[in-house]
């Protein structure tokens, strides 16, 4: 299992200069990693922004054996502006969000992960919508694995219905809680190891 930190996340570089954040750079970074590692037969998956990155890779021609798009719904891929707007509001108003609000919770998460607000704002400028007609061309097995109470990025069931071989797999939790539950990892494992798909 290879789990890279996306640009501006985790241990990856967090440059501030906008020149380092062209459209679709997160997908392009992953193509470069695949090329660097010489991978030719692989599965591909991602959670939330990682799921959006996977969709962009598919839109740009990547064809892994199987795919997991997790923590993501149809609107989070086809209309990225809404989610980008939410995070732009969070990042541009740090310390000013009402306690318990979605923006407050997002800011708290950023603090616990050591997120760099300037670099993360730049990431929002890299987002590219994946139109529904493009999603309908993703003709390979795709597990849409999402928390049963997660609507942060739109409808996971609508996404699964849009994909020719999409399958909705629900796990307990919402966008922030599902990612830390064992059920998510088990659902990903089971989908990738399932025979006959």
Regions found by a protein language model. Name each.
Residues 2-43:
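Active-site loop/oxyanion-hole signature of alpha/beta-hydrolase fold enzymes
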Residues 6-10, 74, 174-177:
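Alpha/beta-hydrolase active-site loop signature
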Residues 44-46, 70:
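Short beta-strand immediately N-terminal to the catalytic nucleophile in serine-hydrolase-like folds
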Residues 52-95:
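Flexible "cap/lid" loop of the alpha/beta hydrolase fold
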Residues 107-131:
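Hydrophobic, aromatic-rich cap/lid helix
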Residues 138, 144-146:
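Short beta-strand/loop motif that positions the catalytic acidic residue
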Residues 146-174:
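Conserved loop-alpha-helix segment in the C-terminal half of the alpha/beta-hydrolase fold
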Residues 169-197:
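Catalytic active-site module of serine/aspartate enzymes centered on a nucleophile-bearing elbow/loop
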